[in-house]
Amino acid sequence: MKYLLLLNKTLLNITSFLAPNYCGKLAVDIFSKVRRKTIRDQEKPFYDQAKKFEVAREGENVSCYELGNPDGKLLFLVHGWESNPGCFVHFLPHLSKYRIIAFTLPSHAHNKETHTNMYECKDAFKLVLEHIKPTEQFHVVAHSLGSSVTTFALSETSCQVDKLVFLSANNKIEQVFQDFQTLLGFNDRVYRLLEKRIEKMVGDKLSEMTVEERLEKVKFNELLLIHDKYDKIIRYENSEVLHQKFKNSQLIPFEKIGHYRMLWNKKVLGEVLRF
């Protein structure tokens, strides 16, 4: 892993001077590549219980899963980066009264595609919403990147949401790219090329892409934020900013429950169910 990081760093730094256009493309390719992770044994029961269906999408269809009570209140589950819908399997026995809809983010889990980004994931969620056509308020439980995907998708719809639950939410998308620069250790020239290419792709300035700004456009009643104070993937401060911004939010801090492990924590589950 360290060797690969060093190789990518060296390659990006050199090409930033010799072939800047290629460097920008290469940086985006490295950033958007999804590491293919095997479905964990504890996640497999999710797929055994679910009814699978697909929503048409250019490239590769969106794999969707329905569980629970077909006549219950609608609840969407949105997983995070390099994860899969099975990460919510621990929640299923306690959500059986709901009509649960989950979907696999592009290029994740069983998908054949290998690269994606938050905007593609956002568009995938919008396609799922268009397919389901909610007629009443619904709930969303989202983890990690899923909170951004949820926010950006809903901000571009007229959907009425009852409760939002964000587990380890991020806020500034720009921070994700800055952390990527820190991880690989490439120079500022590479970062500027990466930033320029991303902004051209999505049509938005990176510095203006924030969950707090987009969430203002979402019609929702309540927001629950749960975050580990020592989360090593997404800083706790992200949830603090969102909580301070929205009066109809509640922030519950935890310690040492991890970023992914929190999805298997009984106390976290209890707080979600109480909400």
Located regions from the model:
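An N-terminal hydrophobic leader/cap segment in hydrolases
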Residues: K2-E54
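Conserved alpha/beta-hydrolase
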Residues: P85, L92-K112
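Alpha/beta-hydrolase active-site loop
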Residues: H115-K133
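Gly/Ala-rich beta-loop-alpha elbow adjacent to hydrolase catalytic centers
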Residues: V141-T150
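Hydrolase active-site cap/lid region
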Residues: E156-D204
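Short beta-strand/loop motif that positions the catalytic acidic residue
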Residues: V218-K219, L224-H227, D231
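Conserved alpha/beta-hydrolase "acid-adjacent" motif
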Residues: K232-N238
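Catalytic histidine-centered segment of alpha/beta-hydrolase-like enzymes
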Residues: I257-K267
